[in-house]
């Protein structure tokens, strides 16, 4: 139906009396707000209201909870902390009037020096970015070392690992940075909120990858019981983790609908999506390996400086503020390991989204495979041979890593051997040697990737108390047809087709007789 143009997205939904909202955004990465003058905008025909943090404060709605246990300004409160941060919300009869009115709102800023380098965020003379929590000594996950510090998280045996490094025959160390990236889904973020004041219920349509989490956040923020918050995610044009969290646009549309009693829609444009919604990666990883002269890895040590931007809005499990980064021993049998992660604030848009649901696994693998290559270079050893020497062997499964992961099965040597044969690895190395002898450059990349399937039991994996698992309810009608209601939400992959095919195979009902419902907190 998507290729036939029959998708139903948030912006396709029109409700009677619906208003539209648009944001006044900061041109500065760091600045104090001295004054906001919305008088000219309010005089424009069709403009209903202009909301600022001053309007939200009496309602205790000027800050919203993030999925990481932090709070984020819905509208900049006295200070802006990243370029294009939301400063005011204009509500008008349609989006075009709202966009025109945005240009009429005048904001007087006092520009402040920004911190955009994570390595400088905790300097002794670094300016305090989050003045709203400057006196808060205890973070959501650990004590705070500095006003711009978010958390410290460690896993593994530090003393044992340090002892291995002290006695190691060979060590290597490298700073490996994974730059900030943006998921950039085809459809930008959007929300349509409709408050029913008679029933005391609110219905919210939005680009939500995790509708149930959104319901929880809306309930926490508004005080409306979860049972009266109905969240619906229609078709979504791509997510990649960008649509897991809650954004100020959602909250402003919801608040406006509650106050005005009419439906209010917000749809961001491409520039807003690329500059103000959640980014990913931005990890600066100092990795070390200890090994024997023959290439047997004996220890891994890593420190990560995680740039989370102005607000910690990650969607990582509560117990794992660095996500699943501690999978960083990968496919290798490394006896000892220790990892420490420090999250910091900078004057950037919130970061740390689980881009493509990696939960930091991508960063972990990148760091590990790079440092293994560095070790291979130091030992003058073939990278494939070094990996073969250190793989977890088939007879070692089930295997528990030095950082606590339980591996159920695998045959990594056989997998790599098959891959090397498929690409003609030996021939490629000979070709590389010949070209280098002629002064030509030719590189051969090699990496292994151990992925986690399933987030884990809910006692270990939750976000804001919402367990990271999903369920499916299947009902068989007397006519022989079926309906399946799921907690998951596809983002353009047409999961409903796949789910129907799986059920058809298992139950023995034709897939065309199976109705799939997803993305609705009422089902």
Where are these regions (language model features)?
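Helix-loop-helix junctions that connect adjacent transmembrane helices in secondary transporters/permeases
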Residues: 128-222, 393-481
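Flexible hinge/switch segments at interdomain interfaces of large molecular machines
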Residues: 10-19, 165, 184-189, 339-350, ...
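Flexible, low-hydrophobicity surface segments
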Residues: 1-143, 171-174, 249, 456
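Short, surface-exposed loop/turn segments at secondary-structure boundaries that line and modulate
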Residues: 51-85, 119-131, 209, 213, ...
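Phosphate/diphosphate-binding loops
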Residues: 86, 92-94, 258-309
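Alpha-helical support elements that line or immediately flank enzyme active sites
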Residues: 23-53, 89-109, 191-260, 317-329, ...
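Glycine-rich loop/linker segments at domain edges
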Residues: 1-4, 66, 140-191, 282-370, ...
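Beta-strand segments within the central parallel beta-sheet cores of soluble alpha/beta enzyme folds
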Residues: 53, 227-234, 261-271, 298-303, ...
């Amino acid at each position: 139906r998507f290729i036939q143009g029959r998708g139903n997205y948030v912006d396709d939904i029109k409700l009677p009396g619906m208003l539209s909202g648009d944001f006044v955004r900061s041109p500065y990465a760091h600045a104090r707000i001295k004054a906001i003058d919305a008088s000219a905008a309010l005089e424009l025909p069709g403009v209903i209201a202009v909301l600022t943090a001053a309007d939200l404060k009496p309602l205790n709605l000027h800050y919203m909870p993030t999925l990481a246990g932090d709070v984020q300004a819905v509208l900049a409160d006295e200070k802006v902390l990243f370029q294009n941060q939301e400063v005011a919300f204009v509500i008008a009869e349609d989006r075009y009037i709202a966009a025109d009115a945005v240009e009429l709102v005048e904001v007087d800023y006092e520009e402040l020096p920004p911190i955009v380098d994570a390595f400088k965020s905790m300097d002794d003379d670094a300016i305090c970015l989050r003045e709203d929590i400057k006196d808060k000594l205890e973070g959501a996950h650990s004590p705070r070392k500095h006003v711009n510090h978010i958390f410290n998280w460690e896993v593994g045996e530090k003393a044992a690992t340090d002892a291995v490094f002290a006695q190691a025959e060979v060590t290597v160390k490298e700073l490996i940075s994974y730059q900030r990236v943006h998921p950039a889904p085809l459809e930008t973020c959007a929300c349509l909120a409709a408050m029913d004041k008679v029933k005391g219920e609110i219905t919210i349509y939005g680009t939500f990858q995790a509708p149930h989490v959104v319901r929880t956040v809306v309930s926490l923020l508004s005080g409306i019981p979860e049972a009266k918050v109905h969240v619906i995610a229609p078709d979504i044009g791509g997510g990649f983790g960008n649509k897991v969290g809650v954004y100020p646009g959602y909250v402003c549309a919801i608040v406006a609908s509650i106050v005005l009693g009419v439906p209010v829609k917000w749809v961001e444009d491409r520039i807003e999506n690329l500059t103000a919604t959640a980014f990913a990666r931005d990890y600066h990883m100092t990795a070390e390996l200890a090994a024997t002269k023959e290439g047997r890895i004996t220890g891994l040590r890593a420190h990560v400086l995680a740039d989370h931007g102005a607000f910690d809005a990650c969607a990582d499990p509560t117990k794992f503020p660095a996500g699943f980064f501690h999978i960083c021993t990968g496919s290798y049998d490394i006896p000892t390991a220790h990892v420490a992660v420090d999250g910091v604030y900078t004057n950037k848009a919130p970061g740390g989204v689980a881009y493509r649901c990696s939960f930091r696994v991508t960063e972990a693998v990148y760091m590990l495979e790079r440092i293994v290559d560095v070790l291979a270079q130091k030992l003058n050893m073939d990278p494939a041979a070094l990996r073969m020497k250190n793989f977890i062997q088939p007879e070692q499964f089930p295997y528990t890593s030095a950082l606590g992961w339980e591996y159920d099965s695998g045959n990594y040597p056989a997998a790599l051997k098959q891959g090397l044969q498929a690409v003609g690895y030996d021939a490629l190395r000979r070709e590389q040697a010949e070209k280098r002898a002629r002064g030509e450059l030719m590189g051969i990349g090699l990496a292994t990737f151990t992925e986690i399937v399933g987030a884990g039991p809910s006692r270990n994996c939750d976000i804001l108390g919402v367990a990271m698992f999903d369920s499916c309810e299947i009902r068989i009608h007397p006519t022989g047809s079926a309906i399946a209601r799921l907690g998951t939400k596809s983002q353009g992959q047409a999961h409903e087709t796949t789910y129907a095919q799986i059920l058809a195979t298992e139950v023995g009902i034709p897939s065309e007789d199976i109705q799939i419902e997803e993305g609705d907190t009422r089902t």
